[in-house]
């Protein structure tokens, strides 16, 4: 039986894990919901093309900023001393000036089939790797005990012949 080096098995496991992670990706959604208290919530803050999630203190903007946001309402981030617009559903942009029509469609059959196939392949590679490791471990363990047995019965150095 031809055996594969452990590096190949590890590389295949890493590739399978990466493919699985790419297919089943997750998105972090900020928890600043209009129904929640606006005093303290978690908001998505983007600075220099580096999105981060940070805990910030949020208050309403002063009354002179009423017309600042075109389709939404103004909020003031106290910790950062900056104002932002919380846009109404369907609008985006710094001042909620762009209409953004989102269309949600169910997953296509091809995407579901690809996901199932990749998960199945990942499970096969994982099971194969575990099988390979168990056989390798058993062979190594039996070789050690066989060598120990041969050393004792052959009358190695310093041992009387049996």
From Swiss-Prot:
Residues 57-97 form the EGF-like domain. It comes from the Eukaryota. One of its GO terms (cellular component) is extracellular space. Keywords: Angiogenesis, Cell membrane, Developmental protein, Differentiation, Disulfide bond, EGF-like domain, Glycoprotein, Growth factor, Membrane, Mitogen, Secreted, Signal, Transmembrane, Transmembrane helix. Induction: By angiotensin II, endothelin-1 and alpha-thrombin. Strongly induced in ovarian granulosa cells by FSH stimulation. Disulfide bonds join 61-74, 69-85, 87-96. Glycans are attached at residue 40. SUPFAM superfamilies: EGF/Laminin. GO terms for molecular function: epidermal growth factor receptor binding; growth factor activity; receptor ligand activity; transmembrane receptor protein tyrosine kinase activator activity. Residues 1-22 form the signal peptide. Ligand of the EGF receptor/EGFR and ERBB4. Stimulates EGFR and ERBB4 tyrosine phosphorylation. Contributes to inflammation, wound healing, tissue repair, and oocyte maturation by regulating angiogenesis and vascular remodeling and by stimulating cell proliferation. This is Proepiregulin.
